[in-house]
């Protein structure tokens, strides 16, 4: 039962907070800093995450129309922060070994994905292989959820804003060419 606490806490926070009120793309971006299990090196973590875990997540994400799932292979330190919180849970930074990013249309979609039997029986148990589930947030040491605002997409400027401002900075930029 403890294994289910974190996914349901994330889903409940998202649903209760109404954080899907996107004004531009209509989508929500979740960025999660992940801590590796103590028995794996950072390189082993990255390799397993990309080659073993990602193929388990991909069909589930596609089924739920997740727009984008990305992994960033990077390490560092961050203040532990629970999903939906605007304040850190502690003042001491914690290590992280990667960043997972999900872009999705609604909080309900993410909640349904995290409650799906495939997630509970295949994906979540696999997380125990390479993620430090004893760490803050069950290894998701900091999670931030916010509105997705596209500025450049497909090598194109897609910023939506004041036309005069756009023209001003297009002109300034052109003066540097």
Where would I find each of the regions flagged by the language model?
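Macromolecular interaction modules
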Residues: 17-177
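Fungal secretory targeting signals
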Residues: 1-21
């Amino acid at each position: 039962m403890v294994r289910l606490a974190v996914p349901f806490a994330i889903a409940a926070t998202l649903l209760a907070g109404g954080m899907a009120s996107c004004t531009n793309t209509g989508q929500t971006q979740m960025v999660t800093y992940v801590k590796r299990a103590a028995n794996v090196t950072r390189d082993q973590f990255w390799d397993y995450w990309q080659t073993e875990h990602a193929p388990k997540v991909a069909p589930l994400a596609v089924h739920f129309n997740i727009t984008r799932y990305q992994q960033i292979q990077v390490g560092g330190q961050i203040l532990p922060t629970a999903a939906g919180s605007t304040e850190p849970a502690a003042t001491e930074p914690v290590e992280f070994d990667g960043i997972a990013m999900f872009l999705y249309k609604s909080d309900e979609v993410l909640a349904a994905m995290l409650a799906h039997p495939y997630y509970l029986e295949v994906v979540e148990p696999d997380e125990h292989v390479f993620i430090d589930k004893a760490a803050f947030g069950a290894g998701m040491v900091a999670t931030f959820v916010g509105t997705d605002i596209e500025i450049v997409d497909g090598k194109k400027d897609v910023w939506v804003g004041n036309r005069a401002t756009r023209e001003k900075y297009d002109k300034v930029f052109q003066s540097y060419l």
